Amino acid sequence: MNCFGKSACLALALAGIVGAAAGDEDQAQAGRQVFDQRCRTCHGGTARADLPLGPSLAGIVGRRAGTGASGIHSRPVMDSGIVWDRASLRRFLSNPQREIPGTLMAGSATNRAELESVLDYLETLH
């Protein structure tokens, strides 16, 4: 492959990376809208829980279930041993009672696209 061919391949690869990042940002923004409509009442704002109900979801990815400084943590969640990642959050948000019987979590995801966008949003919270 000549220099031009290598440069063209690199440019296309970088364009794909930039395009994917922009798509991820769009998905996270869509997830924030779903979060604001369906989750914020119990889990509060983006950086911390504003209400003493559900725990703050800031920094949820990589955190052990049932830990965090704010909100109510149910014993079943604390005893679950789960460390939240995208897959465990997907299972839990799809059917909280099936994943952790006895959890206080009341809501669940209604469709896959909204669930994936909320997961994208949760991954942005630190």
Where are these regions (language model features)?
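Electrostatic cytochrome c docking/interface patches
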Residues: 16-34, 45, 49
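C-terminal capping alpha-helices of c-type cytochrome domains
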Residues: 85-126
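Bacterial N-terminal signal peptides
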Residues: 8-17
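Gly/Gly-Pro-rich "capping" loops immediately C-terminal to redox-active cysteine motifs
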Residues: 32, 44-83
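Bacterial N-terminal signal peptides that target proteins for export
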Residues: 1-9
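Sequence context surrounding c-type heme c attachment/ligation sites in exported
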Residues: 29-36, 50, 58, 87, ...
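The canonical Cys-X-X-Cys-His
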Residues: 31, 36-45, 118, 122
